[in-house]
Structures are given as structure tokens and as C-alpha cells.
């Protein structure tokens, strides 16, 4: 008699994805972030569900409903802070996951990579809309500034912005629709993530060497299930340290002031995970140019498979590529720092240089390094 996990229609899918899946024997801890993102997503959906039970998406009561959750609901404070800091953990894992894909050449799996880029954009949209919901000062002004960017689109811009707002400014209609979208998107993300996995399992995982590992596979369970559990425990430990000891560390104090359309905060800035994008956006003096640079800073990921010149799959054996990769990481950290600084003399120039370097690294320097490494191999 066949094992039920191999014959049952539903169990068979789970078995082929998480139990008998042939996995490379040499994948490092950088391959843990996929499962950690799954853990983050489930955690965000669960905490978000419980928050939605007490939240009201009305401009007059939204701010006080969040206060009510923190003060009066049983363990509401921990649910709220797990959700807010869970978003930060989500983005840490996301950026690590994308960085791993870049470093080890996982972008050669085109479908998986492109669906990953769609996932990244969807998660960013979800996080942005979630940040608007508490209806604090930074929520309101962040929503105003970011939605206003669409008015830079020629001809249809103004109509488009007013259509998204549901009026002539960010108001009740905007908050209600953002809540609706923020609720539905995580489920859409879950569906896209399943397609992401489906395409990944068509080819099998990549590995640090960038060489096919078909000759050396091990079963996913127990080897990688136990490894993923360890990763998840470390993730939850880090999250709970943040939630219980420094819940407001990554937040903005301005968001504890209720939204006031008549009073603009001195520095309108997004959450830390969008600061690099904000820095690229504001380093270009022209509005439309800034919006295009902002969009392209993420969409450039789609072009990376086309810009791959190296004969090696991975950067593991490419010293030049490695140097450039880590310089790119340093550049992104610089952009993140600049995004949090006021728009004044030294910061503007640093931001512009870092923005130029960001695109230069990806479009020019890394492909050139790949070509040089090919030459070195022949030499």
C-alpha cells in the first residue's frame, strides 16, 4: 500500500513541495529567507486579522481606535507592535532574499525571478497602505505626498490622483479604500507566492556555486525542515526582542500626533524600509524625473537577467563582481541614511551621487565586471 502522503491528492502537493522535494545538499543559510518570508506573511495576516476586528477606517475614529487597541483590548498592544515591527522584519527578509538572488545568480530562473519582483512591488504597496491606517501625521502626509506623485503623469495625472483619493484631497474615502486594499492584498500576495514556489519547483533550487546540483540532492525533510525551523525561531526571537524592548525604535514619533491637514510635519519621511527609494526620488529636481527614477529603482530588477554577462552563474568565484556587489549594498545603506536626513546642503549632493552610483553599478559596472572575469578565465 502506498503511503497516504504520496497518494492523497492534497497531501501529494504538500509532500512534493515540503517533504520529498529534492534539494541541493549545499544551500547555505541565505536560502532560509524564502521560508522566513512565509512565516512573516502568515504572522502579518494573523496579527492583522485581530487588529481589523477592533480598527475603524473612519477619519474621525481611526486614530483613537488604534489607541483603544493598545490601551483597552486584551494584549492589543502586543498584537499592534508585532504587526508594525513584523513589517520591518518582512522587509529585512525581503531585501536579504533579493540580495541572495543577485549574488548567487538566482535571477536566471526567469519566471521565478519576475514573479518575485511582482511580489516585492505588491508587498511595498501593502506596507505603504498599512502605514496610512493609524491616521497619524506621518500617515496622512505620507499618503498625500506619495499619491501626489502620480500627478506628474502627463495629461491624466490630476484626474488619476483625484480618482485614487476619491475626492480633492486625502480624506475619509481614501482611508476606507486603503483599509480595504490593505486587507485584501496579503491574500493576493499569498496566492502569488504559491505561483512563485510552483515555478521554483519546476527548476529546483539554485545553490551557492551556481552549478547544476542534479547529481547531488537530498530530501527537504528532515534536513531543511529543521534548518527552516531554526531560522523561524531566530526570526521570532528578533521580532519579540524588538516588540517587547523597543517597540517604537523603527517608528516615527510624528505618527503619535493625530492627522492634521493644516499642519505639515517638518520632515515628511516614510518608514525606514522605503528611505532608499525616497532618497532616489528627491535627488532629482524634476517631479516626473523623480517619479521615473523611483519606479525604475525597483523595476530595474526585471532587467538584471538581461544584464548578466558572466559565464558563471554565481558571484561566488568572481572577485570583481563581489566587490561591486558589496559596494552596491553600501550604496543602498548610504541612500537609506540620506532618505532620513533633511533636504539641505551636504545631504542633497551625497544623495545625488549615491543615486547615480546605484544605477551605474547595476547597468554598467556589474555587466562590465562579468565580461572582465570571462576574459580572466581565458587568460
Curated annotation (Swiss-Prot):
It comes from the Eukaryota. GO terms for molecular function: metal ion binding; ubiquinol-cytochrome-c reductase activity. Binds 2 heme b groups non-covalently. Heme b b566 binds at residues 97, 196. It is a multi-pass membrane protein. InterPro entries: Cyt_b/b6_C, Cyt_b/b6_C_sf, Cyt_b/b6_N, Cytb/b6-like_sf, Cytochrome_b, Cytochrome_b_C_euk/bac, Cytochrome_b_N_euk/bac, Di-haem_cyt_TM. One of its GO terms (biological process) is mitochondrial electron transport, ubiquinol to cytochrome c. GO terms for cellular component: mitochondrial inner membrane; respiratory chain complex III. It is found in: Mitochondrion inner membrane. Heme b b562 binds at residues 83, 182. Keywords: Electron transport, Heme, Iron, Membrane, Metal-binding, Mitochondrion, Mitochondrion inner membrane, Respiratory chain, Transmembrane, Transmembrane helix, Transport, Ubiquinone. A ubiquinone binds at residue 201. The chain crosses the membrane at residues 33-53, 77-98, 113-133, 178-198, 226-246, 288-308, 320-340, 347-367. Heme 1 (or BL or b562) is low-potential and absorbs at about 562 nm, and heme 2 (or BH or b566) is high-potential and absorbs at about 566 nm. Component of the ubiquinol-cytochrome c reductase complex (complex III or cytochrome b-c1 complex) that is part of the mitochondrial respiratory chain. The b-c1 complex mediates electron transfer from ubiquinol to cytochrome c. Contributes to the generation of a proton gradient across the mitochondrial membrane that is then used for ATP synthesis. The cytochrome bc1 complex contains 11 subunits: 3 respiratory subunits (MT-CYB, CYC1 and UQCRFS1), 2 core proteins (UQCRC1 and UQCRC2) and 6 low-molecular weight proteins (UQCRH/QCR6, UQCRB/QCR7, UQCRQ/QCR8, UQCR10/QCR9, UQCR11/QCR10 and a cleavage product of UQCRFS1). This cytochrome bc1 complex then forms a dimer. Belongs to the cytochrome b family. This is Cytochrome b. It comes from Bison bonasus (European bison). The gene is MT-CYB.
Amino acid at each position: 500500500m502506498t503511503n497516504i502522503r504520496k497518494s492523497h491528492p492534497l497531501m501529494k502537493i504538500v509532500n512534493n513541495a515540503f517533504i520529498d522535494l529534492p534539494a541541493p545538499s549545499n544551500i547555505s543559510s541565505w536560502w532560509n529567507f524564502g521560508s522566513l518570508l512565509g512565516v512573516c506573511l502568515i504572522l502579518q495576516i494573523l496579527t492583522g486579522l485581530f487588529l481589523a476586528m477592533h480598527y475603524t477606517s473612519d477619519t474621525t475614529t481611526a486614530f483613537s481606535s488604534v489607541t483603544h487597541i493598545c490601551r483597552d483590548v486584551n494584549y492589543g498592544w502586543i498584537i499592534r507592535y508585532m504587526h508594525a515591527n513584523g513589517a520591518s522584519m518582512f522587509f529585512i527578509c525581503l531585501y536579504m532574499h533579493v540580495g541572495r538572488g543577485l549574488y548567487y545568480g538566482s535571477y536566471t530562473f526567469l519566471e521565478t525571478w519576475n514573479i518575485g519582483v511582482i511580489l516585492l512591488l505588491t508587498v511595498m504597496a501593502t506596507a505603504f497602505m498599512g502605514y496610512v491606517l493609524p491616521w497619524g501625521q506621518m500617515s496622512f502626509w505620507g499618503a498625500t505626498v506619495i499619491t501626489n506623485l502620480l500627478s506628474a503623469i502627463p495629461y491624466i495625472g490630476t484626474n488619476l490622483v483625484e480618482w485614487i483619493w476619491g475626492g480633492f484631497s486625502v480624506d475619509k474615502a481614501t482611508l476606507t479604500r486603503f483599509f480595504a486594499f490593505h486587507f485584501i492584498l496579503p491574500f493576493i500576495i499569498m496566492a502569488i507566492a504559491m505561483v512563485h514556489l510552483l515555478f521554483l519547483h519546476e527548476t529546483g533550487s539554485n545553490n551557492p556555486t551556481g552549478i547544476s546540483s542534479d547529481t547531488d540532492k537530498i530530501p527537504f525533510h528532515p534536513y531543511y525542515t529543521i534548518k527552516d525551523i531554526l531560522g523561524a525561531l531566530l526570526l521570532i526571537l528578533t521580532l519579540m526582542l524588538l516588540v517587547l524592548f523597543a517597540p517604537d525604535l523603527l517608528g516615527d514619533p510624528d505618527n503619535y500626533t493625530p492627522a492634521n491637514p493644516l499642519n505639515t510635519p517638518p520632515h515628511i519621511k516614510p518608514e525606514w524600509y522605503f528611505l532608499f527609494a525616497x532618497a532616489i526620488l528627491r535627488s532629482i529636481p524634476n517631479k516626473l524625473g523623480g517619479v521615473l527614477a523611483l519606479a525604475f529603482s525597483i523595476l530595474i530588477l526585471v532587467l538584471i537577467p538581461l544584464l548578466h554577462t558572466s559565464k558563471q552563474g554565481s558571484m561566488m568565484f568572481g572577485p570583481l563582481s563581489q566587490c561591486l556587489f558589496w559596494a552596491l549594498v553600501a550604496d543602498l545603506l548610504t541612500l537609506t541614511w540620506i532618505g532620513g536626513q533633511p533636504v539641505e546642503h551636504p545631504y542633497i549632493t551625497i544623495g545625488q551621487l549615491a543615486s547615480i552610483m546605484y544605477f551605474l553599478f547595476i547597468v554598467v559596472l556589474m555587466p562590465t565586471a562579468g565580461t572582465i572575469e570571462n576574459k580572466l578565465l581565458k587568460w
